[in-house]
Amino acid sequence: MAQTIYVLNGPNLNLLGTREPEIYGRATLADVEKLCAETAAGFGLIAVCRQSNHEGQLIDWIHQARSEKVAGLVINAGGYTHTSIALHDALVGVQIPTVEVHVSNVFAREDFRHHSFIAKAAFASLCGFGIDGYRLAITGLAAKLGASATA
């Protein structure tokens, strides 16, 4: 039976493709979700992609991941990365292997973006690869889970 992973996207990621394309590129959230589904399938995984502009909804999905025995998480918490102790605590609390991902290189941007509350709850963090960071995150998560690429 295929293992499920959640790909969670936070605030403003629904605007990918139109919001500051010089920073985030022209790819849309639909493009991200298609990339995630295809990448996960290549490892025999199922990617469930969700996006919310609400912190509490993201936390509820993290808790749901635990109750549904989801194998792993990929999270782009958007601006909540730099502000949300609650997301950090939820991730630590569920003890599910997690990869943090960001489309832009947060360290080449404003100083406030240089701190991540999510990073300490994740086994890996990726930034600056555009939406390809999601492919890299799922590939790394698959390796952590012991999932092999399917032919």
UniProtKB/Swiss-Prot annotation:
InterPro entries: DHquinase_II, DHquinase_II_CS, DHquinase_II_sf
Swiss-Prot/TrEMBL catalytic activity: 3-dehydroquinate = 3-dehydroshikimate + H2O
Pathway the protein takes part in: Metabolic intermediate biosynthesis; chorismate biosynthesis; chorismate from D-erythrose 4-phosphate and phosphoenolpyruvate: step 3/7
Residues at the site labelled Transition state stabilizer: R19
Positions with a binding annotation for substrate: N76, H82, D89, V103, S104, R113
Uppermost EC category: lyase
NCBIfam families per record: aroQ, PRK05395.1-2, PRK05395.1-3, PRK05395.1-4
Subunit-level organization: Homododecamer.
Cross-referenced PANTHER family: CATABOLIC 3-DEHYDROQUINASE (PTHR21272:SF3)
Protein name: 3-dehydroquinate dehydratase
Lineage summary: Bacteria, Pseudomonadati, Pseudomonadota, Alphaproteobacteria, Hyphomicrobiales
